[in-house]
């Protein structure tokens, strides 16, 4: 028998072992409930009284439903005592993230997911909160007032944001984590997970959320940190903990929270001379590469230490064409980038979102990495990467000539002048500037030179003075535009809409939510319906003037419509909605929350007639 066949069996067994271990760690949230419950029974002396405190300040977050110049529906509402709890319902005084469900993943603007994302990393958004006193946490309570169940991970940081001296080391520890689970009730609840004990005091807590299973926007009211000033001593009950639980939990946390000692793994991958590679070298190179494509980045690091042949495969730049480093944000630093550098010379998709904050990545370290690895980059994700400055964007513009997609979402610390460098990226097809400080002059320059743009997000860009001028430039230069996000743009009028509608006939998605200066009486919405027949998603959220005439025009002209949000209008009747639903056979999402003519009875009747459509109607208790 050929030696290749037993070798295939061996390799298959190895692959099975890897998958089995990953499957075990994927259920760690279920396995560790008992473990963490025991840990929470820490013995404290009577003198070590528990401190209970609400969040003092919200210091960072990835998105929110509200405006940058308001308190309604913003993350800043998480600071302080509860505003709403124990009441349930949709209240402006709560913290709300920008998305829910899978609707945004089904839109034309949705990006393809990265390969090799660890199965235990499913966070979509986050918020970081500080507290007055550093304590050893004994409990973290989250007051959820509407559609609970989004929080999937709670972390603590060793750094004290209020200390005048920067710490020598910054550590993040997972206090609790779980896979997304569906909570059937929409009522308020006090979420009290059993948290793990950590060996440092903290006053910086991070919540990570996944809203994919939610029926509507989750609303958070407050976060309560319980803790003690002195380090507690575990009781003897902890001897009941299963050692297998500890091993699996440690493995999962390294994969889920960061590439723990990634540089050590790479540096130790220099192997001595072994007797041979068994029969591995009898297999086709491409077959081994294909199998290794299923491993996560930490798995590759471990496998590289087994033999020289597999080390060669694990370090092959072809394994790093798509590189997602976001799951390892808590550990990724300059040293990690340095060791990855030689392996990433062919990288095309790179995700550094959430990474590098609090000094983990320096401007020099990022620049060195891109100078070696930027030439083939096509897609670069940098959402919430607060280490970025003007020099970084200049390096991107110089080192990434083939870049087609750039995401700077919530990089709100970037200075306005930094955005001028984006205009040099003439091949851009996707640009996300949500919650940035881009100014009008820089944006006009970008639009002038980046005429290949197909997807553009300008949501909550508060530094832009005149959105009509921007809309006019978009209509004149961006003829290939397919999706446009103008969420909460403060001053676009019917003139800007006219320029958009005439200049961008390929538009499939348009978000005009919370744009108060648009009035239906000017005919702007009927113009959109006439000139943009390819529309699949249209958000007119909180526009009080949307009326039956607008809905009728959409029904007649935009039959491909899949998502429509008309929250807050007083002038749309059930009859016009029925006509819309009869004409738009692909409609799957219709938000009629706070539409005064659409009561619960009307929603029930429409649901009965069109059961495939998710009709959303929020409420306030």
UniProtKB/Swiss-Prot annotation:
Domain (F-box): residue spans on this chain: 277-332
Q: List the disulfide bonds.
A: none
Q: Which domain of life is it from?
A: Eukaryota
Where are LRR repeat segments found? Answer: 376-397, 402-421, 427-448, 452-474, 480-501, 504-524, 532-558, 559-583, 584-609
Q: Name one Pfam family in it.
A: F-box-like
Keyword Mitochondrion recorded: yes
Q: What is this protein called?
A: F-box/LRR-repeat protein 4
Provide the GO biological process annotations. autophagy of mitochondrion; negative regulation of mitophagy; SCF-dependent proteasomal ubiquitin-dependent protein catabolic process; ubiquitin-dependent protein catabolic process
Where is this chain primarily localised? Answer: cytoplasm
Per UniProt, which keywords does this protein have?
A: Cytoplasm, Disease variant, Leucine-rich repeat, Membrane, Methylation, Mitochondrion, Mitochondrion outer membrane, Nucleus, Primary mitochondrial disease, Repeat, Ubl conjugation pathway
Annotated localization: Cytoplasm; Nucleus; Mitochondrion outer membrane
Enumerate the Gene3D superfamilies for this protein: Ribonuclease Inhibitor (3.80.10.10)
What subunit structure does UniProt give? Part of a SCF (SKP1-CUL1-F-box) protein ligase complex. Interacts with VCP. Interacts with PPTC7; this interaction promotes destruction of BNIP3 and NIX and mitophagy suppression.
Q: Which PROSITE patterns match?
A: FBOX
Q: Which gene encodes it?
A: FBXL4
**What is this protein for, i.e. what is its function?**
Substrate-recognition component of the mitochondria-localized SCF-FBXL4 ubiquitin E3 ligase complex that plays a role in the restriction of mitophagy by controlling the degradation of BNIP3 and NIX mitophagy receptors. Rescues also mitochondrial injury through reverting hyperactivation of DRP1-mediated mitochondrial fission.
> Is rRNA-binding among the key words of this record?
no
UniProt tissue specificity: Expressed in heart, kidney, liver, lung, pancreas, and placenta, but not in skeletal muscle.
């Amino acid at each position: 028998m050929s030696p290749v066949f037993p070798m295939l069996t061996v390799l298959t067994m190895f692959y099975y072992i890897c998958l089995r271990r990953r499957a075990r760690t994927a259920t760690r949230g279920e396995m560790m409930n008992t473990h963490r419950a025991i840990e929470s029974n820490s013995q404290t002396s009577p003198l070590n009284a528990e401190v209970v405190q609400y969040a003092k300040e919200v210091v960072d977050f990835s998105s929110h439903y509200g405006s940058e110049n308001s308190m309604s529906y913003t993350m800043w509402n998480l600071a302080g005592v509860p505003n709403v709890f124990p009441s349930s319902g949709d209240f402006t005084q709560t913290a709300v993230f920008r998305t829910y469900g899978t609707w945004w993943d089904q839109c034309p603007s949705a990006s393809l997911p990265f390969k090799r994302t660890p199965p235990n990393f499913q966070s979509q958004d986050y918020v970081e909160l500080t507290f007055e006193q550093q304590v050893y946490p004994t409990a973290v309570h989250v007051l959820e007032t509407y559609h609970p169940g989004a929080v999937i991970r709670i972390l603590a940081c060793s750094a004290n944001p209020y200390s005048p001296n920067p710490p020598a080391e910054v550590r993040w520890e997972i206090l609790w984590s779980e896979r997304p689970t569906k909570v059937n009730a929409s009522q308020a609840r006090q979420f009290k997970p059993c948290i793990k004990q950590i060996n440092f005091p903290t006053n910086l807590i991070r919540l990570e959320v996944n809203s994919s299973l939610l029926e509507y926007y989750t609303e958070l009211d407050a976060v309560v940190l319980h803790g003690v000033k002195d380090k507690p001593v575990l009781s003897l009950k902890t001897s009941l903990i299963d050692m297998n639980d500890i091993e699996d939990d440690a493995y999962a946390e390294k994969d889920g929270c960061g590439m723990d000692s990634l540089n050590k793994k790479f540096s130790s991958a220099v192997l001595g001379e072994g007797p041979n590679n068994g029969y591995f070298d009898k297999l086709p190179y491409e077959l081994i590469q294909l199998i290794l494509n299923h491993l996560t980045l930490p798995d590759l690091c471990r496998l590289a230490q087994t033999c020289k042949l597999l080390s060669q495969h694990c370090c092959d730049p072809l394994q790093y064409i798509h590189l997602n480093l976001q799951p390892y944000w808590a550990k990724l630093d300059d040293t990690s980038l340095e060791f990855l550098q030689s392996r990433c010379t062919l990288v095309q998709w790179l995700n550094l979102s959430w990474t590098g904050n609090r000094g983990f990545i320096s401007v020099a370290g990022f620049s060195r990495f891109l100078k070696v690895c930027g030439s083939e980059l096509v897609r670069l994700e940098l959402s919430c990467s607060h280490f970025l400055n003007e020099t970084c964007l200049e390096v991107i513009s110089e080192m990434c000539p083939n870049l087609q997609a750039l995401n700077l979402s919530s990089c709100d610390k970037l200075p306005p002048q930094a955005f001028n460098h984006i205009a040099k990226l003439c091949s851009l097809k996707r640009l996300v500037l949500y919650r940035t400080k881009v100014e009008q002059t820089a944006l006009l320059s970008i639009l002038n030179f980046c005429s290949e743009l197909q997807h553009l997000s300008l949501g909550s860009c508060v530094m832009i003075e005149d959105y009509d001028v921007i809309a006019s430039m978009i209509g004149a230069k961006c003829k290939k535009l397919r999706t446009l996000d103008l969420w909460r743009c403060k001053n676009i009028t019917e003139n800007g809409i006219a320029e958009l509608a005439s200049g961008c006939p390929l538009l499939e998605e348009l978000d005009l939510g919370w744009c108060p200066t648009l009035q239906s009486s000017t005919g702007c919405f009927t113009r959109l319906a006439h000139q943009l027949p390819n529309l699949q998603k249209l958000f007119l959220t909180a526009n009080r003037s949307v009326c039956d005439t607008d809905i009728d025009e959409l029904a007649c002209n935009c039959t491909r419509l899949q998502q429509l949000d008309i929250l807050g209008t007083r002038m749309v009747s059930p009859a016009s909605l029925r006509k819309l639903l009869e004409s738009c056979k692909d409609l799957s999402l219709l938000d009629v929350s706070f539409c005064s003519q659409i009561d619960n009875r009307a929603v029930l009747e429409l649901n009965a007639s069109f059961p495939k459509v998710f009709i959303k109607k929020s409420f306030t208790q």
